[in-house]
Amino acid sequence: MKSYLVGGAVRDALLGLPVKDRDWVVVGATPQQMLDAGYQQVGRDFPVFLHPQSREEYALARTERKSGAGYTGFTCYAAPDVTLEADLLRRDLTVNALAQDADGTIIDPYGGQNDLRLRLLRHVSPAFSEDPLRVLRVARFAARYAHLGFRIAEETQALMHAMVEAGELAHLTPERVWKETESALTTRNPQVFFQTLRDCQALKVLFPEIDALYGVPAPAKWHPEIDTGLHTLMTVTMAAMLSPDVDVRFATLCHDLGKGLTPKALWPRHHGHGPAGVKLVEQLCARLRVPNDIRDLAKLVAEYHDLIHTLPILQPKTLVKLFDSIDAWRKPQRVQQIALTSEADVRGRTGFEASDYPQGRLLLEAWEVAQSVSTKEVVAAGFKGAQIREELTRRRIAAVAQWKEQRCPQPQG
């Protein structure tokens, strides 16, 4: 009975990255031996145990055989005669098929260390194609390690494309697609995830609303990159630089979905694309079962992002109505989130990456002014029932108007 550190912990240590989770494989043991040693069994489908002290996961070495459709259609065989090499063979990528024994020796039967040096994400064996979830996992790894110069091996890319063409992605559940997407959105380069999916034709299967934006032109005056699909990924790149918030990054991804509905005869203009995109955001989020708070911000950003760009000329009444519409009084974080998504939209364009975005700062200032109006003072002044809300709104508009005269003076004449 021998334990080996495996997978991500070994990979990240070799890359000089912080190690978060440590997983272990145990060779030469039975479930009863693990229980006798004080381990707690947690795996239902195959034998996984928690260490009595560290609570880290220890899995018995196992092999897998395809026995059904999708990423759950596997029969596992775990027994003392399963070797470490056989266990590592079932892993997705060579850089994940690494192990380390107690004295620090690296066991690398499939060339993972060399691929780390080459910055390559390469599949371990043809069995890679038996699990459609791996298309998403590789896209996520590509995003996670893009800043280190990693790329996907051509033969792995070809295999991913073949899996998509064979309809394998139909076996993925919405929850798994969203889980991988959410994880990818936390990386430094989430745009790489979506670009990777597009490169292997998976984007049109999993995110048809985003794929539909490619080939849709926008006016060159405002969008030198012209293509709305390119612009979308540029805005996601910018959002990742501006905020670590998944809500902000996802809302930015979805901000221009309405442009995919514009009739070709009206190109390159997209009048009303914001409100038009709200239904597509709802559709995408319902299909992937995106959490409600993330969905709701994405809908608001789709509807109002262009309005923020015009903030210096907006009427005080319009600004206060905007705060009402986004429910800022109960969810004040939305003001900052919408400011960031609008900034990502403006700076996610060729040649505009370093642009200043004063509208974002002005939105936050206007919000501070509007929310500084005291509800207690309105009540103390004798207003009752519906009058309280009306007077509160009137005072907020007056306060924002006074602020706006100083901060956004309009030219005379």
UniProtKB/Swiss-Prot annotation:
Chain positions recorded as CTP binding sites: G8, R11, R91, R137, R140
Matching CDD domains: HDc, NT_ClassII-CCAase
Cofactor note: Magnesium is required for nucleotidyltransferase activity. Nickel for phosphatase activity.
Entry remark concerning the domains of this protein: Comprises two domains: an N-terminal domain containing the nucleotidyltransferase activity and a C-terminal HD domain associated with both phosphodiesterase and phosphatase activities.
PANTHER family for the chain: MULTIFUNCTIONAL CCA PROTEIN
Further comment found in the protein's record: A single active site specifically recognizes both ATP and CTP and is responsible for their addition.
Name this protein carries in UniProt: Multifunctional CCA protein
Organism: Klebsiella pneumoniae (strain 342)
